[in-house]
Amino acid sequence: IGSEVVHYTDKPLEVGSTVTGKLDWDRRFDNMQNHTCEHIFSGLVHQKYKFENVGFHMDPDDITVDFSGEIPMEAISELEKLVNQAITQNIDLKIEFPSEEVLQAMEYRSKKELHGVVRIVTVPGCDRCACCGTHVRHSGEIGMFKILDASKHRGGTRVRFVAGERARRDYDWRVKEIAKVSALFSAKPNEI
C-alpha cells in the first residue's frame, strides 16, 4: 500500500513477535521466466508492427497475450525464433526508476498516465516497459520459448505460449504423446 509492502495473515500477530515468511521459489521463478519472456515477445511485436499488448493472462499452464492488430500468421514462427535468439544471447535486464523529467523524455512501451515513482524494465534490443512485476536478471535464465497457438481475436491477435520450465514440460508431454501415436500405428514419429 503506497510505498509499504503489506502481508496479510490468517490471524493477528503480536507486536514485536518474530515471523518467518516462506517463498515458493519454483512458482516465483516460473512466473519470472514467463513474465520476462512476455516482455521480450511483446516488445518485438511492438518494434516490428507497432501493436500494443492489450491483454495478458498468466494461467498455470500457459500465457495468453492479446495484441491490438493482426500479426501475419506467417510471421509467428519468425517472432518465436527472434525471442529464442534473445534468450540465447543471455541479455542483462536493466531495472531503473527514472526521475519524472527523464521519464517524460524516455521511449517505452505502454505509456499510460503514471504518477509517482515509475519502475522501467528494459531488455536491451527487445523491450522497455513500465512494470512492477518480477523478472529474471538475464534472458538466458528463461531457457526456451514456444508459441502454442496464434489466432485472430477481436480485430487483433491472440497468442498462447510457454517459456522456461513450462516449455520443457510441454515439450516432454508432446514427445510422449507422439510416441504413443507412433506405437499405435507402428510408425516412426516422423512418419505419422
Language model segments and positions:
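Active-/binding-site microenvironments in catalytic and ligand-binding cores
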Residues: I1-I192
